[in-house]
């Protein structure tokens, strides 16, 4: 996978794949295998679809709205890209999407810092289980689930945090808890016998803090607050944090899918493997777009109390 350049350079260096125009020469010949990718409207879904196409797969995306991917593809590659619109809460739409599929990469999820538990349960848990059940009915032997380190990380600052078993009981927030339940369901289905005589092979990837061109989550939120002067550094920003550049995340999806047998029944945390201080991370993002980097610091105990108060307020909102 790509070894990331310094953060400030990463946005201006034209070499990253995600910043280059999509060209026909990037794509391997078709390998005649069709992969269903759920949730292709976001940054990870879009780049994963392109990475799978580059690797020679036919890719069928499944989400509620147009992914916009077809417009990026050369005319000769476009026949290998398919799109089915539908929701994970609609079993009939799932059945339609799985026809003729050889494997599944499940990235779709309800992602938000707040919301009613039932909404997370319906999409992230019940939707995943419905997709799993349909995969067994259609005798589809490959199922790669895109999870999150938050399913096994309760907030402790530890090297390797997030690489333990998914724990719904200790996960923080509805998103993490629902993803933890779903991941456990995916891994428990590993080895399920299929009508073809094969067995279902499942694994989970836990990408950590994905960022890159097109990001509307991590980077966009940091920059929005930095422009308004509202980004404090916790204890001076000295804490270490690892992230995952989008090119590496998309490569991990392809490698994980192609190595499902080796990863069967397991979850894998994916990062750049280059921990940086929070101050360096934020400074790099801000410098790259000409925004002043955060300078004021908040003591950790104050931030913890404020965070707990915010969590309680969110819980009271409709």
Which residues are covered by each model-predicted region?
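N-terminal Rossmann NAD(P)H-binding glycine-rich loop of SDR-like oxidoreductase domains
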Residues: 27, 33-55
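NAD(P)H-binding glycine-rich loop region in Rossmannoid oxidoreductase-like domains
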Residues: 82-126, 134, 154
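Short-chain dehydrogenase/reductase
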Residues: 119-125, 161, 171-183, 209-212, ...
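Conserved Rossmann-fold NAD(P)-dependent oxidoreductase catalytic core, especially the SDR/UDP-sugar
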Residues: 126, 130-177
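Flexible, glycine-rich beta-alpha linker
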Residues: 152-153, 200-221
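Active-site Tyr-X1-5-Lys
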Residues: 170-203
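Substrate-positioning beta->alpha
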Residues: 182, 215-221, 235-258, 265-269
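Mid/C-terminal beta-alpha module of Rossmann-like enzyme folds, strongest
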Residues: 256-318
């Amino acid at each position: 996978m790509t070894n990331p350049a310094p953060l400030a350079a990463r946005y201006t260096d034209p070499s990253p794949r995600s910043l280059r125009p999509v060209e026909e020469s990037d794509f391997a010949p078709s390998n005649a295998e069709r992969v269903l990718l759920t949730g292709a409207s976001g940054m990870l879904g879009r780049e994963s679809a392109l990475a799978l196409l580059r690797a020679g797969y036919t890719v069928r995306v499944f989400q509620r709205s147009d992914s916009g991917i077809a417009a990026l593809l050369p005319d000769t590659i476009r026949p290998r890209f398919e799109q089915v619109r539908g929701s994970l809460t609609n079993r009939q739409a799932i059945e339609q999407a799985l026809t003729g599929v050889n494997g599944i990469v499940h990235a779709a999820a309800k992602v938000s810092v707040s919301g009613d538990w039932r909404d997370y349960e319906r999409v992230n848990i019940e939707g995943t289980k419905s997709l799993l059940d349909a995969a067994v009915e259609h005798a589809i032997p490959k199922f790669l689930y895109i999870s999150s380190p938050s399913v096994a990380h309760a907030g402790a600052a530890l090297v390797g945090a997030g690489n333990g078993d998914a724990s719904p009981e200790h996960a923080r927030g509805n998103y993490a808890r629902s993803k933890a339940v779903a991941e456990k369901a995916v891994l428990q289905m590993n080895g399920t016998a299929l009508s073809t005589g094969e067995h279902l092979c499942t694994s989970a990837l836990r990408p950590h803090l994905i960022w890159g061109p097109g990001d509307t989550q991590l980077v966009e939120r940091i920059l929005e607050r930095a422009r308004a002067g509202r980004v404090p550094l916790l204890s001076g920003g000295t804490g270490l944090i690892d992230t995952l550049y989008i090119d590496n995340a998309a490569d991990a999806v392809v490698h994980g899918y192609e190595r499902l047998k080796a990863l069967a029944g397991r979850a894998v945390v994916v990062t750049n493997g280059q921990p940086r201080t929070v101050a360096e991370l934020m400074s790099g993002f801000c410098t790259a777009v000409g925004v002043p980097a955060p300078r004021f610091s908040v003591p950790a105990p104050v931030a913890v109390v404020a965070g707990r108060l915010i969590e309680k307020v969110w819980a009271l909102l409709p």
